């Protein structure tokens, strides 16, 4: 057998095992089908997708995605309406409009280049008792937009449905409500909206997956103690129908 591992982070190369059965693909998993064919595989027995940002990425100051370090900000800033939608939809930031007003006002005077500068700009709208959680939402929203993460997730799941063998498992670990909602809907209905599609003639429901775990799997308290970053993880499993 062979295991293909996808990671678009070049730093992940340092952790690649020396095993002829393992193929490291330094690209986003949205290219799943293309690279399977490139390496001579048309079908997969199973697919595991861990959607979390690695601890290394959180801890590496050079990424510009963590609010804990002073680093050059690796993010695009868009027009006001688009930026508001990004924070509201991808980060579920409650005061998104006020947040964007501060960003736009500051950007009119100078370019926002560092995480520290960004933090100082948005400081007036950060809840004092929920600073860490608020900042996590803000940076999550920007990361999702910059990387096109939700679109990539949908593309990967659609391809997974095509390349999995009958009986093959699709296992996905999510870490926030937006991506979990998409995964939940797709595994139940075959699309991100969760709408079951019926045959126009007989009215039969067409869907290629059946759920293995009806109830989402979450980490135990013991696991959270060992790995606090697993606190928000949710694991869903589906089987491709025969």
Predicted segments, located by residue:
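S-adenosyl-L-methionine-dependent methyltransferase catalytic core, i.e., the SAM/SAH-binding region
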Residues: 1-242
